[in-house]
């Protein structure tokens, strides 16, 4: 018997990989049901994704979709257009001609000196300024990465973001080649629902609404929880690792899907990122009905607000409509009121790890884990649903070898 603690994406994926290896599996989850943050809500206006809206399509995700018999829905051609807001309008390339020339010159000089890779303890802000100049950091690197990591560039470790020290025990990973973005035809929730159904059909035992308690060294275990929960569980068995995990700062995001009446002037594309210097409070906006088909008859937009590791306030449920309207006015010049809002997720704790130097320390100390114990989660050096699936498979392989 192998025990998996956590029934979010990482825990369910680890359980699946264990059953593929012939193991008997039990899953313990503190929440009332599976899925963690991932959920698709179907409303009268269209689908609302509570967390990630799609998978990077590569060999890993293609295999998962095939194994679970899920039909992939590819992103629309319009989603290839991505924008960064500068000087009052969205731009495909936010740097001026002079700034672009400066970026090319600096990057070329760094390449000649073989100095493109991040230095030890170098932040994203320091690295991108060294390689491309201050405008590159301000208008390109910082907004692009705040849209992924929800943290400011001067808090992000360049080595942690760009792969750090590789996999466990310093091994180098080969990333599967990306071929765009896809989602299940029924939304991201379909992936969770199908995986949960198939696991139950395979005889996996689920216990919901249960705390896991202390880990039992006689039971091979995968901990697939948040970083704070994992630190507490791991502490008796790998104290140095648990200490590092517990020191990872966590940040919060609030995403609200708003439905609008379409107009001929609507921006066509994946979405827009907003540098902090623009005065727009949102980190970014996703144009859902431009990214995937069947996301609603009207215009569906998801506005994302983040605390940036405590640097910014988050809107309250009563403020979010006003925030969206003001930010949308800055983007479009219009003051349209949403036709409807998607449901709020109330009281969610900080869920995203800040990828600072501590993440690298965690990677270094993974070797402290006893053979019967493995970890899976978004604090281990890989973000994004496709990469979390890889981590879950590696965790399952580790305990299955025992």
What are the residue ranges of the model-derived segments?
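N-terminal Rossmann-like FAD-binding beta1-loop-alpha1 element of flavoenzymes
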Residues: 2-27
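Short loop/edge segments at beta-strand edges and connector loops
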Residues: 6, 76, 206-211, 377
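Conserved Rossmann-like nucleotide-cofactor binding loop
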Residues: 10, 33, 228
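Glycine-rich FAD pyrophosphate-binding loop
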Residues: 19-42
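Dinucleotide-binding Rossmann-like beta1-alpha1 core, especially the glycine-rich loop
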Residues: 44-118, 143
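Active-site/ligand-binding neighborhood in enzyme catalytic cores
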Residues: 89, 104-220, 224, 228
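Conserved flavin/dinucleotide-binding core of flavoenzymes
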Residues: 94-95, 285-402
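Mid-domain catalytic core of redox enzymes
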Residues: 210-315, 331, 364-365
